[in-house]
UniProtKB/Swiss-Prot annotation:
Alphabetical keyword list: Membrane, Mitochondrion, Mitochondrion inner membrane, Protein transport, Transit peptide, Translocation, Transmembrane, Transmembrane helix, Transport
Record topological domains on the Mitochondrial matrix side: 39-171
Residue spans, topological domain Mitochondrial intermembrane: 192-540
UniProt name for this protein: Mitochondrial import inner membrane translocase subunit tim50
General function of this protein: Essential component of the TIM23 complex, a complex that mediates the translocation of transit peptide-containing proteins across the mitochondrial inner membrane. Required to direct preproteins in transit and direct them to the channel protein tim23, and possibly facilitates transfer of the translocating proteins from the TOM complex to the TIM23 complex.
GO CC, any one term: TIM23 mitochondrial import inner membrane translocase complex
InterPro entries noted in UniProt: FCP1_dom (IPR004274), HAD-like_sf (IPR036412), HAD_sf (IPR023214), TIM50 (IPR050365)
Ranges for domain FCP1 homology: 244-387
Length: 540
């Protein structure tokens, strides 16, 4: 019994020794961290020799095998014990060049397309993988799993477009088709024949079914749609002249940088300054000209300024941005829309671009920047008064003679020359007896015989004899009228403003009353304005 146990133990010990000596079954100690150099090096990894355990040391050695087997095992053990050359040090990775994966994995479509266009050959690893896939057979190449699917060049470029991008392209194509159909349909609709009102405006483009006529009508309608926003608000900006208050000339003036100047500062914000002599300019010339304010400032901004600057309404017609014309990206004040004879119209502005439609009617002044000692505006009054006094048939010829010159200075120079010549003629010419001396015998004053002389004025013949010129007489008359107007404003100015305020309030109440009656009238609740006025008359 004991002999059998000893035999079993010896056989088991021999098996353990054989397993420990076998190189195929020896345990290997693997490194704890896998590095990128393991993939680059084709060398086998470094293994450490397994240490014998106490159990193995206690186990008795098995009988040695044959000599050939011993030599082979010894050679394998020597190969394992030989230490391989140390691998090259692993290069440090520049973390700044790594892609930012916080927004998702970047696409490789651009890289693949660039390689395909440049005809770049794949790297060694990719070539090996391609050969391995080719060796595996068509089944591995067509399968979508395991080897990573199809490689570059096996699918068309459209296969790399996502479904979202395909949907967007499809929607864009449909949008282009719809836009093209709308363009064709709109052109066909705009090219329809004129109605009676349109035919009167477009005599040069008759009705017809020709392709050329169709296109001309469509083009004319499209141009008319755009011009609606570029042309002035009305074809006639001013009503027909009133015979009872008609002036022979029309004077158009600007607002910004001519009558007022606005500026903004950090300390005071927006401030508005009134030019020196504005009141005198407006009140004095209102007796000679139909004054029209023609400004490029919108109504909402300019109307309160005009109401404050001219409370007594010497400006007869204010025209704002809505009355200007928009052409080539600039605002133009076109005088042809004024409903006035252009030979009797003068426009004063500070921007040559605003008056480029009729430069022959324009006087361009330098912009006023807020100088309190400025006299440029007042110095124009004698020249404008002279035009009215001489009653020129066409003011454009007069303005042409002053082209390129400072009008107040040149006019003063010409007037001085004319005055010197007039004084020479008066001194050389003997005083002749005429109707004046004949009337004096009968006790009739000369002023009564001259139709040009007004009540309280000096007779023109006597004025000429004293060396006065006709513009001097007109200036004296204009100054008397101006002083009389100033006196009336001082006496009754507040009353006029109060009456105007009451009239405005009354008009607002009437407007509100009419609006309420019309709204309630839709529902049959309140009587109309005529019924209310009739009831009030009955009560009275």
């Amino acid at each position: 019994m004991m002999l059998s146990r000893a035999a079993v133990r010896s056989i088991a010990g021999a098996r353990v020794a054989a397993h420990a000596a076998s190189p195929l079954l020896s345990q290997r100690t693997l490194p704890a961290v896998w590095t990128r150099s393991m993939a680059k090096d084709n060398k086998p990894p470094k293994f450490s020799k397994p240490e014998s355990t106490p159990a193995q040391k206690a186990t008795p050695k098995a009988p040695e095998p044959a000599e050939s087997e011993k030599a082979e095992q010894k050679q394998q053990q020597q190969q394992q014990q030989q230490t391989p050359a140390e691998s090259e040090p692993e290069p440090e990775i520049d973390l700044s060049k790594l892609p930012d994966l916080r927004g998702g994995i970047p696409t490789t479509l651009e890289y693949e397309m660039a390689q395909k266009e440049a005809g770049k050959k794949p790297v060694a690893g990719e070539e090996a993988e391609t050969q391995a896939e080719g060796a595996e057979g068509p089944e591995a190449a067509t399968s979508g799993s395991g080897g990573g699917g199809r490689k570059k060049g096996q699918l068309p470029d459209s296969a790399y477009v996502s479904s979202t991008e395909k949907r967007r392209q499809k929607m864009a194509n449909w949008a282009f088709i719809a836009a093209g159909l709308a363009l064709v349909g709109g052109t066909i609709y705009l090219g329809r024949e004129w109605d009676e009102e349109e035919l009167e405006k477009h005599h040069d483009i008759p009705n017809g079914w020709g392709l050329g006529l169709w296109w001309k009508r469509a083009k004319a309608r499209m141009t008319g749609t755009v011009s609606y926003y570029q042309e002035p608000a009305f074809e006639k900006l001013l009503p027909d002249p009133d015979p009872s208050f008609e002036r022979p000339y029309t004077l158009c003036i600007s607002l910004e940088d001519m009558l007022v100047h606005s500026e903004w500062t950090r300390d005071h914000g927006w401030r508005l300054a009134k030019r020196p002599g504005v009141d005198y300019f407006l009140r004095y010339l209102s007796q000679y000209y139909e004054i029209v304010l023609f400004t490029s400032v919108p109504f909402a901004n300019a109307e309160p300024i005009v109401r404050k600057m001219d409370p007594y309404r010497f400006i007869m017609w204010p025209l704002f941005r809505e009355a200007t014309k928009y052409k080539d990206g600039e605002i133009v004040k076109d005088l042809s829309y004024l409903n006035r004879d252009l030979s009797k119209v003068i426009i004063i502005d500070t921007d040559p671009k605003h008056v480029r439609a009729q430069p022959e009617n324009a006087i361009v002044l330098p912009k006023w920047k807020g100088d309190p000692k400025d006299t440029e505006l007042v110095s124009l009054v004698p020249f404008l008064e002279f035009i009215h006094t001489m009653n020129f048939p066409d003011v454009r010829k007069v303005l042409k003679s002053f082209e390129g010159q400072h009008i107040p200075t040149e006019f003063a120079r010409r007037e001085a020359i004319a005055r010197a010549e007039h004084n020479k003629l008066v001194a050389a010419k003997a005083k002749k007896a005429g109707l004046g001396s004949l009337g004096a015998r009968f006790g009739i004053k000369p002023s009564k015989l001259n139709p040009m002389a007004m009540e309280g004025e000096e007779d023109p013949s006597e004025a000429f004899a004293k060396g006065k010129m006709i513009q001097d007489i007109a200036r004296e008359r204009g100054m008397r009228n101006y002083l009389a107007m100033e006196e009336e404003i001082k006496k009754n100015g507040e009353m006029w403003l109060k009456m105007e305020q009451e009239a405005q309030e009354k008009a607002q109440k009437e407007m509100m009353k009419n609006m309420q009656s019309s709204v309630f009238g839709w529902f049959g609740g309140a009587p109309s304005g005529e019924q209310q006025s009739g009831e009030s008359e009955k009560k009275a």
